[in-house]
């Protein structure tokens, strides 16, 4: 399949290279999730209303019994962390959603007639209300929309808490309706994305289409440079051949990748 920059045919790519990029992005997202977990895995018990308690509490023991990695040492900060903790977790989750949303956009685009790189089963498409030739990629469109919704949550949380002074305020109650659905929403998003990717069909031999021949222009430039032609001259020669319709592909897709 062709690779794109600026939505223009750039260089040869492959299904493995394309999907592998998203796999690697998700591994980076996992690092953010781990960091968010570590920042959240602190014991706030004993902070009471935000200024500690005179009760003889063993905070180290409760930290160990409840499985926290450590404790919040400052009672005021334990309360100030409300909203901050939720925003940190939501940001990590939104990073996963952003990756999934970009993949969904690719799939919507690559499924369209103008690209035609992937084919979706009928169970993942719907017909048009009046155009019988259309099969719309509804599943990936909804994945994209739900991913964008999750991406907006960190800002929603920030706007609830951003100008609060020190201490607890009832404003924080609004976090619950924003934050709690996040976990099920992302899990559902990952489940349906997994199903969709597993059931889509990647078309083969895409690069044999003459439309994508210019994608091999870089290899042709490199070949001429290796024969002693200055890069600038080789670049201009190949560009002129493409402009005048005389460019011929010599490199194979295997050699290029």
Where is each model-derived feature located?
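Short, flexible active-site-proximal loops enriched in glycine and acidic residues
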Residues: 1-6, 73
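Residue-identity detector for glutamine
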Residues: 8, 39, 64, 79, ...
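Internal glycine-rich alpha/beta core junctions
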Residues: 11-160
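Catalytic-core signal marking the mid-to-C-terminal active-site face
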Residues: 125-257
């Amino acid at each position: 399949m062709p690779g794109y920059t600026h939505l223009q045919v750039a260089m040869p790519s492959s299904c493995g290279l394309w999907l592998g990029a998203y796999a690697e992005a998700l591994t980076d997202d996992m690092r953010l999730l781990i960091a968010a977990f570590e920042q959240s895995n602190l014991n706030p018990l004993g902070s009471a209303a935000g200024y500690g308690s005179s009760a003889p509490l063993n905070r180290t023991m409760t930290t160990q019994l409840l499985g926290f990695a450590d404790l919040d040492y400052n009672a005021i900060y334990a309360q100030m962390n409300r909203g901050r903790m939720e925003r940190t977790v939501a940001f990590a989750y939104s990073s996963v959603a952003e990756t999934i949303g970009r993949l969904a956009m690719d799939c919507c685009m690559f499924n369209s007639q103008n690209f035609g790189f992937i084919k979706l089963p009928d169970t993942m498409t719907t017909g048009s209300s009046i155009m019988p030739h259309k099969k719309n990629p509804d599943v990936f469109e909804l994945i994209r929309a739900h991913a964008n919704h999750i991406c907006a949550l960190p800002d929603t949380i920030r706007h609830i808490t951003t100008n609060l002074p020190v201490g607890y305020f009832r404003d924080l109650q609004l976090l619950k309706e924003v934050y709690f659905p996040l976990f099920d929403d992302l899990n559902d998003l990952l489940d349906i994305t997994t199903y969709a990717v597993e059931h889509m069909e990647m078309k083969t031999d895409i690069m044999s289409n003459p439309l994508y021949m210019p994608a091999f222009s870089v290899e042709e430039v490199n070949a001429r440079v290796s024969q002693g032609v200055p890069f600038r001259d080789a670049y201009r020669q190949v560009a002129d051949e493409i402009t005048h319709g005389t460019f011929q592909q010599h490199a194979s897709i295997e050699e290029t990748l």
